[in-house]
């Protein structure tokens, strides 16, 4: 398993706070969200949203980016969000790599 960041954004017009279709997706999906995640072998660690910026970042643990792609489609979030999937590492790993490289 590996850590990934799911960075997403949508327009003001497609925001679930403003758009009834997007809101329906969010409210309908919330009932099965954990099941959809489990089906795609994803463990959701954190979810952060900036409502007025219309952006979000979710931190997940999964085997590969393809699982995330399928999860975003299955959950409906890909219907109104542009999504970027980014592999993540812990900051401490950067520090250790710098120490090994020296100055």
PLM ranges: what are they?
Residues 35-37, 75-78:
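Short, conserved catalytic or adaptor-binding loops enriched in Gly and charged residues
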Residues 58-59:
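Conserved RNP beta-strands of RNA recognition motif
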Residues 78-90:
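Conserved short beta-strand edge segments in small beta-sheet-based binding/regulatory domains
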Residues 1-54, 63-67, 88-103:
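Short S/T/G/P-rich N-terminal loop/turn motif that feeds into the first structured element of a domain
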């Amino acid at each position: 398993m590996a850590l990934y960041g799911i960075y997403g954004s949508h327009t003001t017009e497609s925001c679930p706070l403003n758009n009834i279709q997007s809101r329906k997706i969010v409210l309908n999906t919330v009932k099965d969200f954990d099941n959809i995640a489990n089906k795609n072998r994803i463990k959701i660690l954190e979810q952060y949203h900036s409502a007025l910026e219309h952006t979000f970042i979710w931190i997940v643990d999964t085997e590969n980016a393809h699982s995330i792609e399928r999860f975003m489609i299955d959950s409906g979030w890909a219907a109104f969000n542009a999504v970027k999937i980014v592999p993540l590492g812990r900051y401490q790993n950067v520090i250790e790599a710098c120490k090994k490289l020296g100055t």
